[in-house]
């Protein structure tokens, strides 16, 4: 009997198909009508992503007995991440619209690349095989290589794009070689049988091959997450890319990589090896300590948010080390809060961004007197990232510390608490600058797309800060 794709298969991958079709429509419009592209590409991008969200729910009952299940599996967790990625794509599209309104650049190809990146993210979240995971990561990465150098007149953009491409290409080799070693050891790359296959092998050589393969895959993911010492690309790339690209990398890439960690270490290899956990512990310690100390010295905001993002990656790795159901709930809640607050910060930067040099701390002096709303928005987002009560950021960090303490990882709890105190200093320092005496009375231009992102972030933070119980209940059900 020849396997064929059925209607059920197409419904189950509906979000992927819609994102792919949206990307093709955008590039066709850009190819044949540049004027039409300038007017409609952003709307088509947002519309396609929104339609994909509805398609997720349309495929809820259609993920069984699918021919694609060995490669792509839209289970409950995959649907959660898919919706998450699509919302991130909508936010990035709105910030890009605000950016192009200010800089008057051609942008049809930009939204095509953004859709391609979201396509890669969805593949990661729904991956049922290491090869699918690799394809998703590389689809995302290749799109970002081009997006980072999208502003052709910005020399710094070219430099950051080339650096990211060069280092990312090397890491892709590590990922693929790691997958090859795993296949050589156990004869499969399917995530659902990795652990059982590993436990059946008896030869020391095969165990070494398997362990080496997992180590190389983890190294590749650590690079994508910008964990210390694999972080060196991140500050330069964040500083050199445009504001919407940096926002998408800080949120989309981070969530995508941790979706890959979830698939690998929560589902395929839960509590894989005690010695391997010690290696990841070391990465967490190094990331938390180094990133927070270096962030103290930054004066350019995009570079500052690069180190802030590295620091948060360290916190996000704590639940990965623990690897149980409650840790998964803590991880997903932290990811959501981090994404909302980061988008809010970049919505403010969309108002302040003037050129390729980006926004410096000095540009924030007296922002409250120029725009009380923007200063308040940035303040609440920074307080959330710092984890200061009563914001949702405090709840997210508390949840992570709670599961770490219950699992006996006292060292991670102590280092996490100390670095949280340190990070509070540099976040509060920025807030102090916002409310200082103004050195510039120039009015800021209004941007509807950035205002939508900022207002949505503000409302979401307020709701999750004071009424998080329903959302936490959903995440608890998700992890079970």
Swiss-Prot record:
Q: Pfam family example for this protein?
A: Proton_antipo_M
GO MF terms held by the record: NADH dehydrogenase (ubiquinone) activity; NADH:ubiquinone reductase (non-electrogenic) activity; quinone binding
- Record keywords, A-Z: Cell inner membrane, Cell membrane, Membrane, NAD, Quinone, Translocase, Transmembrane, Transmembrane helix, Transport, Ubiquinone
Q: Which coarse location class describes where this protein primarily resides?
A: membrane
Q: Does the keyword Translocase apply?
A: yes
Q: How does it assemble?
A: NDH-1 is composed of 14 different subunits. Subunits NuoA, H, J, K, L, M, N constitute the membrane sector of the complex.
List the PANTHER family hit by this protein, alphabetically: NADH DEHYDROGENASE
Q: What does this protein do?
A: NDH-1 shuttles electrons from NADH, via FMN and iron-sulfur (Fe-S) centers, to quinones in the respiratory chain. The immediate electron acceptor for the enzyme in this species is believed to be ubiquinone. Couples the redox reaction to proton translocation (for every two electrons transferred, four hydrogen ions are translocated across the cytoplasmic membrane), and thus conserves the redox energy in a proton gradient.
**Family, similarity comment:** Belongs to the complex I subunit 2 family.
For this entry, the protein name equals: NADH-quinone oxidoreductase subunit N
Q: Which organism is it from?
A: Protochlamydia amoebophila (strain UWE25)
